[in-house]
């Protein structure tokens, strides 16, 4: 039985709200990391959310999903919101290659998925952060996808996704990005 005191202390150590839109979501390959973080008390599932503004969500090499920091373009993106501890945030940052310029963790405004877009009365926006494609290649990735964004990363969209361990190991993530962007 979880006591109220334990729940309060777990919530107190959560330092960031992280919006996940791709392989970290339930049912996808990298969700195992969030499951581990939940088990250790370093993450807590908050709920299903969507971006308040439109953003481009596209797939890159190996069907890897990327959110692009171009507010007003694309569509409102559906995902999941998690509260994470500083330790959990470090593990997510490592997965997303923050120090290697794979992704950037940036602020984003969110609303509950069940909120009606035509009803702005009384909506409380939630300030979180999301992992966006790094600005060094994001614009080119948007163009490569014909400036067409997705609403969500679904099983159908993810069909053909290749896990990191199954990709060529003699090339870096950025090598894969460059090759994808240069391909016809």
Regions found by a protein language model. Name each.
Residues 2-184:
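Glycine-aromatic micro-motifs
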